[in-house]
Amino acid sequence: MATLESRLVDMLTVPVEALGFQLWGIEYVQAGKHSILRVFIDGENGINIEDCANVSRQVSAVLDVEDPISTEYTLEVSSPGVDRPLFTAEQYAAYVGEDVKLQLTMPVAGSRNLKGAITQVDGQMLSLNVNGKELVVALDNIRKGNIIAKF
């Protein structure tokens, strides 16, 4: 059975792309009785507040018709930002050489939280240099991954 996030990606990719943007990813966070659905979009020329508002209206209309979430939730549409979350193998591969912060489902090398540089992405496996040590992490073991912004 597909996860809610993967069903939402399938449902929302075409409407977001029809507006000229890329659906970067989706996070669904349950917070008690009220949940948050975060939709991250990206574009060739970046994203502004008007872009987010337009996508929000379109996504909201699709969600009202499809009704994939049975509980009350807040819809948030935004750019991924400088510390952008990473969702797919392609996104991780695009950031080889960059530092990332990972939260894992199962520990790797005794830790569920890793920080290091992406050295390689091979299929569904991510290689990470953590303090000079090469670690391999299955992408399906990553609960959350973000770029570490450099200022």
Curated annotation (Swiss-Prot):
Q: Which GO terms describe its biological process?
A: ribosomal small subunit assembly; translation
What GO terms fall under cellular component here? cytosol
On whether Cytoplasm is a keyword of this UniProt record, the answer is yes
Q: Which InterPro entries match?
A: Ribosome_maturation_RimP, RimP_C, RimP_C_sf, RimP_N, RimP_N_sf
Q: Which branch of life, at top level?
A: Bacteria
Fetch the Pfam families from UniProt: DUF150_C (PF17384), RimP_N (PF02576)
Which Gene3D superfamilies does the entry mention?
Ribosome maturation factor RimP, C-terminal domain, RimP-like superfamily, N-terminal
Q: Which cell locations does it reside in?
A: Cytoplasm
User: What keywords were assigned to this record?
Assistant: Cytoplasm, Ribosome biogenesis
Its function, per the record, reads: Required for maturation of 30S ribosomal subunits.
Family to which this protein belongs: Belongs to the RimP family.
**Xref: NCBIfam families:** PRK00092.1-1 (NF000927)
Official protein name in the record: Ribosome maturation factor RimP
